[in-house]
Amino acid sequence: MKRLSFLDRYLTIWIFLAMALGIGLGFIFPSFVGGLNKLQVGTTSIPLAIGLVLMMYPPLAKVRYEEIGRVFKDIKVLILSLVQNWIIGPTLMFILAIIFLPDKPEYMIGLIMIGLARCIAMVIVWNDLSKGDTEYAAGLVAFNSIFQMLFFSVYAYIFVTVIPQWLGMEGAVVNITMAEVAKSVFIYLGVPFIAGMVTRYIFVKVKGKEWYEKVFIPKISPITLIALLFTIIVMFSLKGDVIVSLPLDVVRVAIPLLIYFVLMFFVSFFLGKKIGANYAVTTTLAFTAGSNNFELAIAVAVGVFGIHSGAAFAAVIGPLVEVPVMIALVKVALWFQRKYFGSHSM
């Protein structure tokens, strides 16, 4: 069985350490915070914007866009994946946000953003560890990357502004426009998306696919973690005013996230098995639906609502919960393989 890299395996610990470092910097060196506040254009923090774009670039440079045609070969599986990723996932997270955070509309938004952002990076890792279908996973990642580029802003507007109004949840309504979200999506997803596609096209053509995937990609992969931790340090250095309530708030946000990741995985796995997909495709569907693009959720939450917002804070909790849960679910998937698929699983 493949092993998770040292950096990825302890990602939750690195995030906690980054939070602590950010909080410490904010209290011990207030001049550090003052310096960060000066590096802004309007409401946009320049260091944070750079960190967020860099965080998104390696995952999008890894995407095998040429594999997207694979997802159209089995329409039944494609429809199931679309339903799981773009109907069940966002709706489930919306419901959980309402149930667990009715008095915290900004935290609700952070959760909703996580539910809307379909995974395009770590899902490849979980899929490999659980012996999923590598090429099909690559196709779904490519498909979801393009789908998010086109429709994320529409989804965000519907789930954050329109549906709460329909349900009469006036206290939870946050008025945003599709243009606001689209602007952040373009900056934090569009720019690295274009850069990733161009990078892949040029280097594969000049140096070859094997060099690109075995030499170039491993070299740029750590950028995502470094940029993520940098982003968290900056965010938490500016949040000294909420430190006292931080532990309780982390737990309140973490509980619905835990329920979401577990439910999405199990529901998606058994739906895949129900339609007759083999183990490799079934587990790929389950991890694609069950994991999320927390980098995009953080970026959009910061871009639209600001670095000090509850939405940005809630989005940061996403990877804290997701990583250890997904590591556990990899073991569950391999147990399901032995129990339900046997020797004919691949």
From Swiss-Prot:
Protein family per UniProt: Belongs to the arsenical resistance-3 (ACR3) (TC 2.A.59) family.
Sorted UniProt keywords: Arsenical resistance, Cell membrane, Membrane, Transmembrane, Transmembrane helix, Transport
Protein's recorded name: Arsenite resistance protein ArsB
Annotated transmembrane regions: 13-33, 41-61, 82-102, 106-126, 140-160, 184-204, 216-236, 253-273, 285-307, 318-338
PANTHER family recorded: ARSENICAL-RESISTANCE PROTEIN 3, ARSENITE EFFLUX TRANSPORTER
A molecular function (GO) term: antiporter activity
Membrane topology: Multi-pass membrane protein
Function: Seems to confer resistance to arsenite by allowing cells to extrude this compound. Could be part of an arsenite extrusion pump.
Keyword Transport carried by entry: yes
Further remark: Deletion of the arsB gene results in both an aresenite- and arsenate-sensitive phenotype in the absence of IPTG.
Cross-referenced Pfam families: SBF
GO CC field: plasma membrane
